[in-house]
A protein has these predicted regions:
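A structured, charge-rich N-terminal accessory region that forms the first stable segment of a protein
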Residues: 5-7
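Short, intrinsically disordered, charge-biased short linear motifs at domain edges
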Residues: 9-17, 44-51
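Short metal-coordination and nucleic-acid-contact micro-motifs, chiefly zinc-binding Cys/His arrays
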Residues: 18-25, 53-57
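Short cysteine-rich clusters marking metal-coordination/redox-active sites
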Residues: 26-29, 60-63
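Short recognition patches in nucleic-acid-associated and regulatory proteins
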Residues: 30-52
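Acidic/histidine-rich catalytic cores and adjacent linkers
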Residues: 57, 158, 165-170
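Short, positively charged, Gly/Tyr-enriched micro-motifs
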Residues: 64-151, 165-168
Length: 170
């Protein structure tokens, strides 16, 4: 999967069609990817409505892997948009989830921010010219930044939500 910050979005038949402005390189091997097709993904937006997304599926002929192109307001493997996560973390009363879910979201974000900051520090050591200024971001911008970095460098694992939430695999 790849997170894109610059994308075109238009609605057709109630489905938001998301298309990245630039085709990103493969996060696994760095090869050039080709568009293979589209898939559907549903996410709850900040008003609590279910929003259908049509996402591009990209194929890397070099490593023979498929990747979905996600907009930066979608968190991988989560059904709520990033804005709901940020509102729950900031404890505003505008979020559309119950208090128990909001508490779980706050714990997940706290752990994810720690993991994202560690990933960025490691990248900064490997690439000293990397510019990082995420301390000045709002919660939503910081969340989008960390999700984009962690996913695009290949550090996001499908079990990351279990690892980050402190649940053991045993």
């Amino acid at each position: 999967m790849i997170i894109v910050a610059q994308f075109l979005k238009h609605v057709k038949d109630g489905i938001c069609i998301i298309t990245g402005k630039v085709t990103a390189p493969c996060p696994d091997c760095g090869g050039r990817m080709n568009v293979h097709g589209r898939c559907r993904r549903y996410v709850r937006n900040e008003s609590g409505q279910r929003e259908g997304l049509s996402l591009r599926v990209l194929y890397c002929p070099k490593c023979h892997r498929y990747h979905r192109e996600l907009p930066d307001y979608v968190i991988p493997y989560k059904h709520l948009c990033a804005k709901i996560f940020a509102e729950a973390y900031d404890a505003t009363k505008n979020y559309c989830v119950d208090d128990h879910t909001a508490a779980g979201l706050r714990r997940w974000i706290k752990d994810f921010f720690r993991f994202g900051a560690a990933t960025v520090r490691r990248l900064k050591l490997e690439h000293p010219i990397l510019v990082t200024n995420y301390d000045t971001f709002s919660t939503l911008d910081k969340l989008r930044y960390f999700v984009r970095v962690v996913v695009n460098v290949g550090e996001w694992k499908s079990t990351s939500s279990r690892i980050l939430s402190g649940l053991s695999m045993i």
